[in-house]
Amino acid sequence: MAAATAAAATVAGEGMEPRALQYEQTLMYGRYTQELGAFAKEEAARIRLGGPEPWKGSPSARATPELLEYGQSRCARCRICSVRCHKFLVSRVGEDWIFLVLLGLLMALVSWAMDYAIAVCLQAQQWMSRGLNTNILLQYLAWVTYPVVLITFSAGFTQILAPQAVGSGIPEMKTILRGVVLKEYLTLKTFVAKVIGLTCALGSGMPLGKEGPFVHIASMCAALLSKFLSLFGGIYENESRNTEMLAAACAVGVGCCFAAPIGGVLFSIEVTSTFFAVRNYWRGFFAATFSAFIFRVLAVWNRDEETITALFKTRFRLDFPFDLQELPAFAVIGIASGFGGALFVYLNRKIVQVMRKQKTINRFLMKKRLLFPALVTLLISTLTFPPGFGQFMAGQLSQKETLVTLFDNRTWVRQGLVEDLGAPSTSQAWSPPRANVFLTLVIFILMKFWMSALATTIPVPCGAFMPVFVIGAAFGRLVGESMAAWFPDGIHTDSSTYRIVPGGYAVVGAAALAGAVTHTVSTAVIVFELTGQIAHILPVMIAVILANAVAQSLQPSLYDSIIRIKKLPYLPELGWGRHQQYRVRVEDIMVRDVPHVALSCTFRDLRLALHRTKGRMLALVESPESMILLGSIERSQVVALLGAQLSPARRRQHMQKLRKAQMSPPSDQESPPSSETSIRFQVNTEDSGFPGAHGQTHKPLKPALKRGPSNATSLQEGTTGNMESAGIALRSLFCGSPPLESTTSELEKSESCDKRKLKRVRISLASDSDLEGKMSPEEILEWEEQQLDEPVNFSDCKIDPAPFQLVERTSLHKTHTIFSLLGVDHAYVTSIGRLIGIVTLKELRKAIEGSVTAQGVKVRPPLASFRDSATSSSDTETTEVHALWGPRSRHGLPREGTPSDSDDKCQ
């Protein structure tokens, strides 16, 4: 009986609208294995059957300040003061401004504290290395042990507390902003795991980044802040406002990371949104600017800076920063960076795929989860050991010190009439005794390239923006030093001579490679804000645009690649310059076998429709012959209809009618035994997978004011009925009446898979009539067969009268735009009101990937080659379809909504 109830709760939860994905921790990235799957159904069933969350109080339970005045405790007085202050601030300032100020302040404090802790960790490693320079073996052990311990701690701490904190965070935020709910992704424990894990990972000195994880951290901070402010009431009780605040939080994450508010807003829009609501523009700029300001003020307060300056300030020439003849060199940097960015994304994805295909190694490393990050860290630390191979790749420099030296405007080569100002101490790392600048830069680029691609697969909180940024700066510096060597006297223009500035080439290379990996143009703006100079705006823009053009034609962005690795729901971008996307139409890609129910169907038809599809929506048509689309109905509504029709309450009513018909007239005058006088206790020991899963079988789906008394009574009686009869009914409904032994074994097997088994004793009250008048299983099955043949009354169901619809000749390009703009996951295809197919996110994704490229060969749908674009529906077909609209008036369903209503419902 417990298994039958658990199975019913699972099936009843299949139609719940929130979409959640099951997270599975793998060796590297982790992935979401259930595509809107069983985990969401179980969670929906638990929430529906178990009631509201324990931390959420009812709105009516919130006390007003007037009522709080009666309390004499100190807590009551503090609550009154806080409520009054909140009302004053809201009336004078506004809720959005308060939220954005708090968000910017908190993120600036977190960013500064993390930078301070990371700097202390890196200084400790350098101090240990210098203190043991007399013994090369001890120095090596200290150099490799320190990062291995930090990375291992970061991986273990994250795995234990919140595995969702692993990785960048931008791919998941892109999915969340599209409407998908990721379980435990914006919680407090994930925030703690992300902050501590990222601090340890970056403090180890591995080639990892901070920008991507900080987007996730800012989003978690915004979600937690929204929950806190919702305790005071106001607009943050509305969950739809959280999406707007998450969009602003993504901008804050980049802004407080690099003190680049403008570039942070633009970068967050490019990497997380396909279509951006302009109403959120000012929120992102305000919060990012305030956060960047506080972040730099804290640096001045800590005496790290004398005043508010750029993070990597440069001193390039302003009167003549570059010559026109240098533009081809900048263009070469952009094209080469495009190929390099595509190669980096490909290499990163291949590392993950190869490790997953090696089943034996993968199985072994999954059992020893900390072994893989420890081995990768040991390998990278060994290669960067300064007295060893690290001397040929500036291994003793941190990422910040590396960028400072690469952006230096002085040349490192000593040939001809070059500017000899004396290299700074950190620049000496690029000129080892047994190598020159060019060899060191080449080795640095090649080694850091594959090291960064490998290090970003470690299951710790980390990003890839900063390592790619450093590699691009090194490549630009290599081109700049080469130009300075080829033109030692500079490029002659008229009577003036201007020497080459290699630091400018490094800035161009950093922006180009970072833009190629992320498929963004806003990296140019980030570079300008990082360096504090805009002198090289034209070379930077040329290189970034060329790099994006090359990279987008070869590989997806790094974040889209991770989305595919983690198997998150996504909608790929349409390739530009492809004419196939305009010739492919919806009728070529739609699924013609649409799960639907007719208005005049029986309950048997409903059960058959549930067995045929696992989707959360069913189309409601006028009749199987006309196929006129009347609306859509959720799967949960259909399950509720079937459950109410075959409920124990209806079966008891049927038994009472039979008993009254069999009784003689004198016996009819006798009063039936009162339920108050003959009550017995039934004690059932049950195994429940959900807390409170047996408290009630079905939660009414309509508000209490809209339900009739008979419906409410039947549902309430159904919850306290005999569980054995309910189990037989549910098995007959969802399992097609299988043998009792096989059903029992399957239910026991499903129970064994449940991780949260709770032993609970259920005490219910049952009358004598219920105990004495039981029906046999054969009688129950016969009665259920009769009930399944009755017609369905949809008047008590919630029906969407205006589901999103497309016509069969809608192009693939327009369909992609509609799905991206509205965030819908399915659309019905109609022809003059007649349902002919359905298009889901899965079919659209396959069509886009097939029409753009498939293994290097363009693929077109089969019907696209035989279509005549000039043809249209015949007059006979049009007349026949219009004739079907007449009988619709006899049905009492809500009329179809306007297209604007449909758009609003799909958002």
From Swiss-Prot:
Question: Any idea which GO molecular function terms this record carries?
Answer: chloride channel regulator activity; voltage-gated chloride channel activity; voltage-gated monoatomic anion channel activity; volume-sensitive chloride channel activity
- Source organism of this protein record: Rattus norvegicus
What result is annotated for mutating residue 25 to L? Constitutively open channel
Biased region (Polar residues) positions are: 710-720
Q: Which residues lie within the membrane without crossing it?
A: 170-177, 245-257, 261-269, 503-517, 518-519, 520-531, 532-536
The CBS domain extends over 590-648, 799-859
Q: What is the lineage of its organism?
A: Eukaryota, Metazoa, Chordata, Craniata, Vertebrata
Q: What is this protein called?
A: Chloride channel protein 2
GO cellular component terms, A-Z: actin cytoskeleton; astrocyte end-foot; axon initial segment; basolateral plasma membrane; chloride channel complex; dendrite; dendritic spine membrane; myelin sheath
